[in-house]
Amino acid sequence: MARITVEDCLEVVNNRFELVMMASKRARQLANGVPPLIENTNSEDKPTVLALREIAARKIDSKMIDEIEKAERERTEREAMEWAAAEVVADEDMSKSDD
């Protein structure tokens, strides 16, 4: 696959700072298991390269990245609440068995 350049991405994103922020957030999402939006023909591509390819292909924008982050954050919070609730139930069960 052709090499991706910053210039390719700057045709989509207005400035380098925004590009760096978008690419780093998206790369983190990809590294954490969020599936890529483009075909990953080269399995050796690192998450950063995939993120830049998605940006250059106009498959992702900052709004989509923020929505994915929000969904991941909500999922994590929900899981934490479920674990906390399970611990409370387990603690109550243990205190009842001590009686």
From Swiss-Prot:
Example of a GO cellular component annotation carried by this entry: DNA-directed RNA polymerase complex
Main enzyme class: transferase
A GO MF term: DNA-directed RNA polymerase activity
Transcription as UniProt keyword: yes
GO biological process, one term: DNA-templated transcription
Keywords on record: DNA-directed RNA polymerase, Nucleotidyltransferase, Transcription, Transferase
Chemical reaction(s) catalysed: RNA(n) + a ribonucleoside 5'-triphosphate = RNA(n+1) + diphosphate
EC number in record: 2.7.7.6
Highest taxon, organism lineage: Bacteria
SMART domains: RNA_pol_Rpb6 (SM01409)
A Pfam family matched in the record: RNA_pol_Rpb6
Function field: Promotes RNA polymerase assembly. Latches the N- and C-terminal regions of the beta' subunit thereby facilitating its interaction with the beta and alpha subunits.
Oligomeric and partner information: The RNAP catalytic core consists of 2 alpha, 1 beta, 1 beta' and 1 omega subunit. When a sigma factor is associated with the core the holoenzyme is formed, which can initiate transcription.
Similarity annotation: Belongs to the RNA polymerase subunit omega family.
The protein's name: DNA-directed RNA polymerase subunit omega
Organism field: Xylella fastidiosa (strain 9a5c)
Lineage: Bacteria, Pseudomonadati, Pseudomonadota, Gammaproteobacteria, Lysobacterales
Gene for this chain: rpoZ
